[in-house]
């Protein structure tokens, strides 16, 4: 079998085809079902070019094709087969011109370079513009609720493969359902008249995959959604699982057991270009959003549709090709667009309480928009639950997106990459072995739905600001600042509550084969702001889990599991203590080691002892000065307004870290040489090495680096040790001194509250009227014709696949930032000048000369390295030596204090003279005062 490069345009002639631009049969009208598939095909005599979706997916394999048969290059677990996309060399059933070439004849240049702000304005216009001569349609309300089905554009419904169109009684592929939910998520129930279209198909839901978003751009959103659809395709096509294979054999395709929920946190912050992407695949439509229904404010706009289309991160349109076994399968999508920005916890309440209660899924997979699940990542998570009935939650490996190593040129990205890697190699496996993973990251994790019901979700949702009035003192209004910070890491609360659930024995697990990529902050200001929430939330949640450990005794865990949990609790307590004192320990390590080198090893890196002493002293002052600077910055400035000072701090601490590393290496070499010179056996030499002061340093360095290396090679993932470890070592002090200080100084910032939507105010409101029977409530709405819908859809596709040009996000300091900056500069100068004066007076003597003076009084035979010895000494000489340096310093300091006292006296005398002069003039004035 001949195998081809999967990224070439070479395909055998007999297997080439091109979807017709103008199908012989028109688009199906609403309510009718398309009698044909595929569209008329035009077979080319020459080679037809194809474009593969090769956007740098990590771990994705290739594919080869010859005479219509597909062969795996690798085995099924390691191979990712991506569907074909319509590229410049192929035609599209959607548009008569290539939508991917910006500035084409039917695509104005402005549309491909539209800014985000103009996209938002255009979005508002499309929601409110009236259509003249439109047909008026009456829509019945369901128990007073607005729930309506809308025809999808013809190209969307025409894209579905014929093999999925068996049910002629269903409009699943022809109509999209819109629900204007005017209730709280807890009240979104069939009893209250709210019923999802997906539940009407009477299908069991095995997997509910949720993607939560805030203001991510269309590239980030498409990256996540497209790779989720690839994962669903791989689940349905897998031959490794009897569960999914049996389901397909019984006539229940796997995709019918999977639902994708998209939850957007607010109409106002959402990138409107994302809505173009969703509209292209049929999950959204312009002009149907309702602000109010009979005076009841819409809380969420819910769209439901089953689509076989996708847009990848290029962005390019991905549509099925007849006979291609790598086509995407249909995906049931529920899009929940919240009217207001009410935070991620509220988005999860819509997911678990509104959608979950109706769908009753077995497993819920949580993803953040921008996270890119790898090949079979979702399948590996599901497999872990399927094979362990006591598994309540799981997470995969999240690693930094490094763009084939290009982003590692940024030291911040490299340092974070090392953090992610070592966490996945050391921390997560350890916690998984105990059965309690302290945090299942919300960006990529999964929960068994029945496991989180009850107290876990109840406690979790106490942090929802929209429930504050209902919960009273149990909500955020009754929480202290420490408890509020705990909910900044709400995923940690859910993890602990799940493991400690009364009468249950749920465990948490780390699933190594399940991998996902995520973007990491590339700027210092972004990293500082992100870690504030992480550090404060994780610290508060760690304290919470320690103080509530007794609740584990009410769970159903066995004695062996409880033993493991006790060991883990002790480990967590020690880790918490070390984290608390990290600031002091880092300073002590730095100050002791840089002084240890010239004192114990008698090595002066800067020539003489005097110069080395002063340079080390300056380094220590600089260290403390920038530490003090962090306190001033953190207490009064936003990181984005002080980018320059924060970047300077990172560079300074990186230099000091480099100096510390050099000193440590030299001390280690000296210790090894000393051990080799000592007599005795190898055991004695090792004992002398590790019992000495330098030996402890050697042991610490060897154990840390050695453990990192061995563990990385054990997991066959050592490359970060060479590409990211040096950057991490240089930035490690900044992670403690900068990030921790900023986090604790902003402990009060818990970012509660909701933000209203200005754009929602411009949406239309609807009011119902009674029918002639006086009971049925209906609303009147303009109905678009299929032709108008298809015509406007062309513009939607053009906007969706237009090259993305992000808006300039360089935020300029506002007036308040400028005022704070001036205050910060003034306070820093004030503190530094005072500190400089105090330190300079305390160190007027320079290098301590007491030791050589004392040694001069001792006999020449004295050798302190021989142990405790008794020698004859000159007591008077030693006394004078000890007093000499102190007297010398005292003499210099007395001069300074004399100057201070005389200056104080002079200033006081000036004030006194002024006082006397005023008194004299006042007394003398009485003589010539006129009455």
From Swiss-Prot:
Protein keywords: Cell membrane, Cell wall biogenesis/degradation, Glycoprotein, Glycosyltransferase, Membrane, Transferase, Transmembrane, Transmembrane helix
Positions annotated as glycosylated: 536, 691, 819, 866, 874
Enzyme class, first EC level, given as a word: transferase
Recorded name of the encoding gene: CHS7
Location(s), subcellular: Cell membrane
GO terms under biological process: cell wall organization; chitin biosynthetic process
Induction of synthesis: Induced by high temperature. Induced by the antifungal agent caspofungin.
CDD domains: Chitin_synth_C
Residue ranges of the TM segments: 573-593, 615-635, 647-667, 695-715, 725-745, 826-846, 899-919
Catalyzed reactions per annotation: [(1->4)-N-acetyl-beta-D-glucosaminyl](n) + UDP-N-acetyl-alpha-D-glucosamine = [(1->4)-N-acetyl-beta-D-glucosaminyl](n+1) + UDP + H(+)
Name of the protein in question: Chitin synthase 7
Biased composition (Polar residues): 7-28, 83-92
